[in-house]
Amino acid sequence: MSTNTDDTTRTDGTFGDYGGQYVPEVLMPAVEELTDAYERYVLDNEDGFVDDFRQRIRSFGGRPTPLTHAPTLSQRHGVDVYLKREDLLHGGAHKLNNALGQVLLAKYMGKDRIVAETGAGQHGTATAMACAALEMPCEIYMGRTDVNRQRPNVFRMRLHDADVNPVTVGSGTLKEAINETMRDWATNVADTHYVIGSVVGPHPFPSMVRDFQAIISEELRAQSREQLGELPAAVIACAGGGSNTMGAFGAFVGSASLPGAPAGTHEPAPDVDLLAVEAGGSRLGVDDDAGYAPNSASLSTGTEGVLHGARTKLLQTETGQIVESHSVSAGLDYAGVGPELAHLVDTGRITPTNVDDDAALAAFHRLSRDEGVIPALETSHAVAALDQYDGDGPVVVNVSGRGDKDLDTVIEASAANDIDAAPDMEVFEQ
């Protein structure tokens, strides 16, 4: 039986005014097939699918990930700070939770080819790893801008035998990569499954990705009870499309639906503050004339519209044209956000905030220096948001991924912005 607590996941996937299935007619059979598979295998654990997934994410992925105290951050902020260490999951980020779940679901559905988009390269890497483990052909679409700033992950994907296709149209970032992946899916819908990387897209993707990622907050609730003796006062997570955000928040808002969780894990916890940290870039706002936003803060400043199959909050012009977004972090560089996140912000359950590029870069160095943890630039936004937190209870920062993929970007951006970067490097010649 399903442990589903959110009735919307069994209808059209709407969350208040957001969500839905805004897709071309050619994709509706695939979306309907996936919705049926989601309800049968994920929500109702048909054929023991969820049991299989939970076993694989433990043995292959290395779950559970630890909850660790950050003493220097705690002293700096005058409150106990804990880190949920998704950087220690196999592959170095939270992305494997969803990628392994969806590739496994595709196997159960009888599909024999996987396509996926990626921004920072972490979702592409996780999908390529899952496909290698489950013997599925894999094709990844990645914007040319992201290919250039995330070369280590491009190499990792190819090591796992994935084909990586640079997308050269538009700004060459995540939005364009999603567009190209959807075109591929529409062309090859009979035998191909699209492993979308975030809580975006048409139903059932936002609910399904949330459910796979909510294993983060399942563990976090249990670990908090054991280590703190109580739930945290607040959880802070970065927000781009929103997969790690809903993973960190899902079990606290009561909407995640993956069977097999300990009793009470998904009961709403309204006393836990949830802070979603967006990329403030260089400044907020949208330049209508240039069709450009120097940020990726859809929750903070976006307006309602439709993108990639769902109604949500978007960075767009007054006439409804999606603009090019910006963030120093490739994984947050997206002009939209998941529909459930948009709804939870509207209802006041989640508090949106934003951090600019310079503050994120400074937080990258601070966590590396003070706690021995090199965070992804995405995570660095959440770490920087601790400066905005004024509560007095324990706070958890979700470390969505590790930062080795970002070292070239950090060195270049830190030098350009005169931020205290890595020590001077000397080249010694024999």
Curated annotation (Swiss-Prot):
Catalytic activity: (1S,2R)-1-C-(indol-3-yl)glycerol 3-phosphate + L-serine = D-glyceraldehyde 3-phosphate + L-tryptophan + H2O
Entry-annotated residues carrying N6-(pyridoxal phosphate)lysine: K95
GO molecular function: tryptophan synthase activity
Cysteine pairs bridged by disulfides in the record: none
Residue ranges of coiled coil: none
Record pathway: Amino-acid biosynthesis; L-tryptophan biosynthesis; L-tryptophan from chorismate: step 5/5
Cofactor(s) recorded in Swiss-Prot or TrEMBL: pyridoxal 5'-phosphate
Keyword Lyase: yes
EC class of the enzyme, as a word: lyase
CDD domains associated with the record: Trp-synth_B (cd06446)
GO CC terms, sorted: cytoplasm
Family: Belongs to the TrpB family.
Assembly and interaction partners: Tetramer of two alpha and two beta chains.
Protein name (database record): Tryptophan synthase beta chain
Record organism: Halobacterium salinarum (strain ATCC 700922 / JCM 11081 / NRC-1)
Lineage of the organism: Archaea, Methanobacteriati, Methanobacteriota, Stenosarchaea group, Halobacteria
